[in-house]
Amino acid sequence: MAPWSSLYRYVLPDTPGCPELVVDQNLRQAAIDFLRDSGAYVVNVPAFAYTADVSAYTHAPAADTQLSGVIEARVAGQTHSMQLGTPSIAYNARTALYPSVFIAGDDNINFTLWPTPTVSGTLAYRYSAYPTQTAATVPDIVVAQWADAIARGAKARILALPGKSYTNAKLASLYEQQFRATINRAKILRQRGALTAGTRVRFWPFGV
């Protein structure tokens, strides 16, 4: 994990006189917007054991991050259908014996395996995340891949602040356009599985 100061060199030269605290706040918000809207930060969670006759499990996202969405879940090595929420009688009757993983929660990732497993096995999953509003750090891989994009988002916000020595509405608008364009590019790369060399990231919407 990298501190926000690791991104200063992309921001401070273009925002002279801006306090570092303000830079931190706007870098954080830019990172939140970028990763939430693009899904570009994907965490692959190694398989963990589940036990027979126990259907509910809870995991916490990585430090300083919060869940954006679960992309894929594999139970006993097989990809399962994912649904948002919890199982219902109507769903159970409609899909008799079709295996599903139900996802719920914000601060934690709550899984419900349905039908309840009758034997022990493993569950592995991958999810997208973004920084919390109090995050003091950002994942290293995000800095390596998207430092310039996040910096442009931060500069757009900083330069749009009214009445400051560094206020520049025209440049702020340009940076905002570039920031949004890069979000769209990152979203496409994620859907194509091209974000990280050697790692395939498959887009799997809820309910499929």
What are these regions (language model features)?
Residues 1-208:
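Glycine-enriched, solvent-exposed interface loops adjoining structured elements
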